[in-house]
């Protein structure tokens, strides 16, 4: 491993209740409501038992962002697009829903979402807690950048 592949640890910071209304407009501009609604809709498609609820918002030290349902139990995730069925934490499921959202909206011209996709995928590949859920999805596993995968021991 060279010095170029060694990265500082990435951290997630939960957004304080007093800042929740500001963070998404600051990151996504006029598209913030579209991003938020798409994440909720994708979670509804990913998890048949998901019925809405409170979400936690997280900013990442690499400038990305994700949101995850506020719940302690694991979620049964199913995705017909690749035949995936498996359980993952609410945190990992939220990251998956955000990755799918960012990917879809990037193809609709949202450059910020394209950037967020790659930054969040880097975090997901690096963070052991998230990696457990993400790497169950073959589509996401192959997207990890090589230097992140090397540093994460993949």
Go through the PLM ranges and name each one:
Residues 1-46:
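Terminal domain-start segments
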Residues 2-18, 105-154:
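Low-complexity intrinsically disordered segments
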Residues 14, 44-47, 81-88:
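Short, charged/polar micro-motifs that form catalytic or ligand-binding hotspots
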Residues 20, 51-54, 92-98:
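Short runs of predominantly hydrophobic/aromatic residues within well-ordered alpha helices
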Residues 30-74:
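Amphipathic, interaction-prone secondary-structure segments
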Residues 31, 35, 50, 102-106, ...:
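Short, flexible helical or helix-coil boundary motifs
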Residues 43-47, 99, 123:
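Hydrophobic, Leu/Ile/Phe/Ala-enriched alpha-helical segments that form helix-helix packing faces
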Residues 78-121:
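Compact, glycine/acidic-enriched structural inserts
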């Amino acid at each position: 491993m060279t010095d170029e592949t060694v990265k500082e640890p990435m951290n997630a910071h939960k957004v304080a209740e007093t800042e929740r209304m500001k963070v998404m407009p600051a990151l996504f501009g006029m598209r913030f409501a579209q991003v938020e609604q798409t994440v909720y809709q994708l979670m509804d498609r990913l998890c048949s038992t998901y019925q809405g609820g409170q979400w936690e918002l997280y900013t990442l030290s690499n400038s990305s962002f994700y949101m995850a349902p506020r719940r302690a139990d694991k979620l049964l995730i199913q995705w017909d697009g690749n035949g995936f069925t498996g359980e993952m934490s609410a945190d990992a499921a939220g990251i998956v829903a955000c990755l799918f959202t960012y990917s879809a909206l990037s193809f609709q011209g949202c450059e910020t979402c394209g950037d967020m996709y790659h930054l969040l995928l880097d975090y997901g590949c690096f963070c052991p807690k998230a990696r457990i859920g993400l790497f169950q999805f073959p589509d996401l596993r192959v997207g990890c950048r090589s230097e992140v995968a090397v540093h994460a021991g993949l």
